[in-house]
């Protein structure tokens, strides 16, 4: 395939002001589109349909902007969904690109960022964990990594579908290759082996139980295994075990035998043959009841790195092929694609999608729909998982809707609540105070909408009202602004607010919201019963006398889960904040010492005490520490001393 003459990784629109942007003249519906046609070039690009508030209704790409946009003027040929979109269009924006492949990448980025109402939108706000092997230490560390891969002296393998999947792999690497997982600072301060050495999951390089050369051999074996050469490693270990037995080194032979068993176990649980699959993502879609589930299996080096289910938002008119095509473009917007994507359906413009992903990756990316053999079996396995996951979700949604209908009836809401917000706070005698908001609705917990509030104002120990006031003022003051700006703010407005407490808390919160100008939110306070027994809660709400629910009422269980989730989130948030405070050291009081330099110092000297005792020359020799910074550190710990 001839690669297009364009950058290897096309810049996003926001980062590329040189891309020509054309705005439509004022109008509405077909009128604004017809007026726009006079300005459009016969070139590739991306177009956006906007409503009266400037919100994106639809984002599309085209080989020829002029021809593609012209198709929207033929209303009678459009499906009902696009007819409604055209009728709501008040303005348009056009961005031209170098190639159609670049337009496809930009379209996927804009859809993911703007979430237009009439597009298929991938709801995926999670980052994916990777396996990282450090390379800037004599004895490399293996660990889980999440986030940007900015550490140059490190190798990465992944992605993995979940933290569980990568943790399982780390455990396997410890058992088979005896690699250390401790931090550099812990490594530098060990005086005897840790428990992992006792259970044969580490070779204890921290206390010289293994030479640097032998450890390097283990690292090389681990790299080979992660690259799909497990069979080769197994043969090599078998040879080493035989040699140890012949030399009557039975303890060493037994240790190697245990490593072979671990390797055999890992390979025996693999679902694919490394020789036939290698590096690929297996992607299958299943549709039912107007909804879709997309299952992605991550295969790297012939190993199954786990799978994850996605539920893209779309209308019931979208086909499985439509959903799969939109999913692939958006899914790889912020992550590198593997060389092979195995699909259960062909998608529209499959060659163009392959070209765009190849452009992004800087190498060939193939999209393939297998019809026989092991690859077909793997795709069928992913398809079965997609079907079963969607069946579970539909069943859960039906049950969730019944519970929400019960909540609406119980608290006299006009309709089933789409967004319930639950608030709680946590502190110890006024220290490290945090408030939290958790959100639930028809889809269950909306964890991307959870919020933490670090309480800024001075808090009198035990003054929970002051904490609640600050939290609600910040949340609803911002919410009012967002609500006035467009439909997204309206969608994020709660139908019901739950708080932990009784009549006093309910009255206080109503007073806070009245001061802000919020009068259309239903408030409910949940008070614990006598002896704080679960199941004997009292419910307080405006316009109703306090009441209890029957102990086995499903709605009672649901409301308890809402309250308990807010309490759990508040406790974990407070603990995280408290831990952050407790790990402060004297290094935090030195000007110019941020997180990166602090980490460099602790990794080099092992502790803040080691930094304090270090001489100026040793500080200047620390990687990442300039001479000026070293002098500042030395002067902090040795006031009055000359820094020669």
From Swiss-Prot:
Q: Name one Pfam family in it.
A: UvrC_RNaseH
Q: What is its main location?
A: cytoplasm
Question: What positions does the domain GIY-YIG occupy?
Answer: 42-120
Query: Where is region (Disordered) located?
Result: 1-23
| Coiled-coil regions listed | none
Q: Name one GO molecular function term.
A: DNA binding
Location of the protein in the cell: Cytoplasm
Give the protein's biological function.
The UvrABC repair system catalyzes the recognition and processing of DNA lesions. UvrC both incises the 5' and 3' sides of the lesion. The N-terminal half is responsible for the 3' incision and the C-terminal half is responsible for the 5' incision.
PANTHER family noted in UniProt: UVRABC SYSTEM PROTEIN C, UVRC/OXIDOREDUCTASE
Family of the protein in this entry: Belongs to the UvrC family.
Q: What's the protein name? A: UvrABC system protein C
